From Swiss-Prot:
GO terms for biological process: mRNA cis splicing, via spliceosome; mRNA splicing, via spliceosome; protein folding. This is Peptidyl-prolyl cis-trans isomerase-like 1. Belongs to the cyclophilin-type PPIase family. PPIL1 subfamily. It is an enzyme of class 5 (isomerase).
Length: 174
């Protein structure tokens, strides 16, 4: 996944759009998984099933339970922990997991520094535009299980350029 331009994925959600830049040099397998899932429409119609203010928003599970989702490599794949990447602030994109080497399709975006997650989750990108949308997501009302009271959906996830609404196709290896 080398090339002159970074890879971006734009999410159109119930509360607005945001774009993430993928760290293909640091987590190539994870970025390929995420981009391919987006390209295939896997995330379209999926909800953000867990939102915790001052911590993170989580989505990517087509069952909406927090227990589902698979990768393009099969059920699960290995972590790509990179020592240079740390949970230093809001807007960091990482894989949700249930322990080491259990990555599938679920991801989360931080809403604050979370250094206690360093070395436990693969960081593979950052929000490059649309942090206001992330803040709107963070502010939705949730129940006792951190699930939004009203469903917040990903209407569409697409590969593109860095601009909001960009539709420039980016080639991804198989």
């Amino acid at each position: 996944m080398s090339g002159p331009s970074p890879t971006y994925v734009t999410f159109d959600t119930s509360v607005g759009s945001f774009t993430v830049e993928l760290y293909t040099a640091h987590a190539p397998k994870t970025c390929n998984n995420f981009a391919k899932l987006a390209e295939r429409g896997y995330y379209n119609g999926v909800i953000f099933h867990r939102i915790i203010p001052n911590f993170m928003i989580q989505g990517g599970d087509p069952t909406g339970t927090g227990r589902g989702g698979t990768s393009i490599y099969g059920d699960r794949f290995a972590d790509e922990i990179h020592p240079e990447l740390r949970f230093v602030g809001a807007g960091i994109l990482a894989m949700a997991n249930s322990g080491p080497n259990t990555n599938g399709s679920q991801f989360f975006i931080t809403c604050a520094p979370t250094p206690y997650l360093d070395g436990k989750h693969t960081i593979f990108g950052r929000v490059s535009s649309g942090m206001k949308t992330i803040q709107r997501l963070e502010a939705v009302r949730t129940d006792k299980d951190d699930r939004p009271v009203e469903e917040i959906k990903i209407h569409r996830a697409r590969l593109g350029d860095a601009t909001q609404g960009g539709g420039l196709a980016v080639a991804m290896p198989a």
